[in-house]
Amino acid sequence: MAKIAILGFGTVGSGVYEVLCRNAAGVSRRAGEPVEVKYILDPKDFSDHPAAQLFIKNFDAILEDPEVKVVVETIGGTRFAYPYVKACLESGRSVCTSNKEMVATYGAELLALARAHNCAFLFEASVGGGTPIITPMHQCLAANVITEVEGIVNGTTNFMLTKMVRENLGFDEALKIAQELGYAETKDPGDDVDGRDACRKIAILSSLVCGHQIYPQNIPTRGIRDITVDDVAAAEKLGCVIKLIAWMKRGEDGSVAAGVEPCLVPKANQLAGVDDVFNAVLVKGDMLGDVVFYGKGAGKLPTASAVVADVVDALKNGVKVHDSLFWQPAEPVEGMLTDPAPAAYYVCVEGIAPAVAEAIYGKGHVVEEHFDGCSYFVDSADDKALAEAARKVEAMGGSVKLVLRRLPEDA
């Protein structure tokens, strides 16, 4: 019998326990042996819980019990989770986690520890929640050189942007609804709306694609706080919707570019129709072409189901999974992983006339005129040209309020 310990009994941790109880027979059959939770580590009081006898507050009890084969980490963050996970791997116990911050920051180190101590470190739920993406990329797409990953990986901001489009709501109104429904944190929604959550996820996928650690701090990241109802209306005029896009590209020379940013997505693009709390990740392979992974990116039971699937994988395959699921350590690079390629852009400027905007930005057209400025569609520009245009706008007493890249239609 395989004994399991769960670290943290919040939304995901309690979901893992529920999945293991409700689907015990199927999980055990697939794992090849009975699977049972022996410990649940959490500092809170669960004396009234039906499984009260499983709760402990001493982490060392798990390390000292030779019966525990797999540890599920759902604490979140890195302050406690990282040392706990490190200790478990060093003791030869496999770890399954949904902790994107830990994987994005310490993934290479923890993968190496798993290899060194003949166990597994698995994290399917860290990117897609309940939507499989890690396993398909390192197993099913193993015959491909992956050149690009692009997608919607944060359900909260996608829900908010959907509300802003469908109901003509402002950012604050959409955020309030997301908080009331439990999609966004009430105290500090910054991880979602400022793009940090999406940044960690694309850092993990970039590390997997490139074979070495890509750090979140090297990925240019912008959230959706600056998006207004006027921008949503302008996007509609251009035949687009606004989505928070996480992306990475790998050049033929091995160069890497990555980013998280709100973008104009043409309605013909596959990502344009991904609404509400759903996520979608488009992966480009040199042999397969484009493949899209779609589903709910969060939620108690969807995320827990991915964690439990990792538990089964750890019990069946152990360290063998790291024949394909692995990346090397690397130091953070200097600067940001920007993409030098030109693209079409939407810019919103204040304090200058439309004719002046046209003279500064070049070939394109005015989308909307405002009382104190305009929005302008630039047919083609790169980062250098946009920066130079912004300097000219500011020199004339104006300001650039928003810049959105437009994705191609055929993605």
Predicted regions, residues:
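A short hydrophobic/small-residue beta-strand
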Residues: 94-96
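A conserved regulatory-domain signal marking ACT and ACT-like small-molecule sensing domains
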Residues: 311-411
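Catalytic, metal-anchored helix/loop core of enzyme active sites in primary metabolism
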Residues: 146-150, 158-161, 165, 183-190, ...
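Substrate-binding/catalytic subdomain of NAD(P)-dependent oxidoreductase enzymes
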Residues: 173-273, 278-280
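Rossmann-like NAD(P)H-binding beta-loop-alpha module
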Residues: 68, 115-197, 204
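N-terminal glycine-/serine-/threonine-rich beta1-alpha1-beta2 phosphate-ribose binding loop
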Residues: 1-91
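Conserved active-site and cofactor/substrate-binding residues in soluble primary-metabolism enzymes
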Residues: 7, 11, 15, 35, ...
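Rossmann-fold NAD(P)-binding glycine/threonine-rich loop
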Residues: 81-87, 91, 100-138
